Regions:
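Conserved hydrophobic site in ankyrin repeats
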Residues: 189-190, 216
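Recurring C-terminal helix/loop segment of individual leucine-rich repeat
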Residues: 14-18, 37-41
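Repeat-mediated protein-protein interaction surfaces in helical alpha-solenoids
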Residues: 148-163
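Structural signature of tandem-repeat unit edges
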Residues: 1-11, 21-34, 44-60, 69-146, ...
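Eukaryotic acidic, Ser/Thr-rich intrinsically disordered low-complexity regions
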Residues: 209-232
Length: 232
């Protein structure tokens, strides 16, 4: 069960995808508004929610995200957002028999970045990146930055600069993420940032992605054709 697409669905009942261990992608229309519990229990390969809705449209995405604490990518028409994993803990204060609820991971805060009407609050989402840099891995931060830069709906100049600065400081992780995802748009974006491509080209060849290697080799050939009068 690689992909499920239900355009007319309004309600997802409890345990709708229970034990769908091969489920990787769920595609829904804009009208989903009711969600039961335990929707994706044991769906350990789930990677993507695709909502066929405008990037600024009110949707049920916030509730849908609440059903998944693992890493998840969201695709809207014109936007792509990556939400990192978060964990919840109940710690018992033994003498008082009180349980303290704690949450670990910036992914929880990012899942709260919505307007009162139910649309994604892109400014709030982008503002969470600085805190995410404290605790998230290079790979996850590169996924987040690449998604926002490749489809920059609602992306402000300051946030764009922050994402580009992070990718520039972590070229190896950025290229590896783009290559592992076979994401040619992300690869071209990184090339456009003038990042060194030699190691990325070697990795492309190693994993057998010829289209990506062509993008990187094209950059290298163009670079060799440039010169100034000092070369004469």
């Amino acid at each position: 069960l690689g992909d499920v697409y239900k355009r007319q669905v309004r309600v997802l009942d409890s345990a709708a995808f229970y034990n769908c261990r091969r489920l990787r992608r769920v595609t829904l229309g804009p009208g989903v508004e009711g969600f039961g519990s335990d929707l994706f229990t044991n769906c350990r390969q789930l990677q993507t929610f695709r909502l066929r809705a405008a990037a600024d449209a009110p949707t049920g995405l916030k509730k849908l995200l609440g059903a998944v604490s693992a890493d998840i990518t969201v695709e809207l028409d014109g936007a792509q957002l990556f939400y990192p994993e978060y964990s919840e803990f109940l710690d018992e204060n033994t003498p008082a028999h009180i349980f303290n609820h704690s949450i670990e991971g910036e992914g929880y805060r990012m899942r709260q970045c919505f307007t009162p009407g139910g649309a994604v609050d892109y400014a709030a989402f982008d503002a969470s990146f600085a805190q995410a840099c404290v605790g998230e891995s290079e790979d996850k931060l590169c996924r987040l930055a690449l998604g926002r830069l490749v489809q920059p709906f609602g992306l402000g100049d300051d946030a764009r600069a922050d994402y580009e600065l992070y990718l520039t400081a972590h070229p190896k992780a950025a290229f590896r993420r783009a290559i592992d995802d076979r994401d040619e748009a992300a690869l071209r974006l990184l090339v456009g940032l003038s990042l060194p491509t030699a190691d990325a080209a070697v990795y492309c060849a190693r994993v057998g992605w010829s289209a990506g290697a062509a993008v990187l080799l094209g950059r290298a050939k163009r670079a060799k054709k440039t010169y100034d009068f000092d070369d004469l």
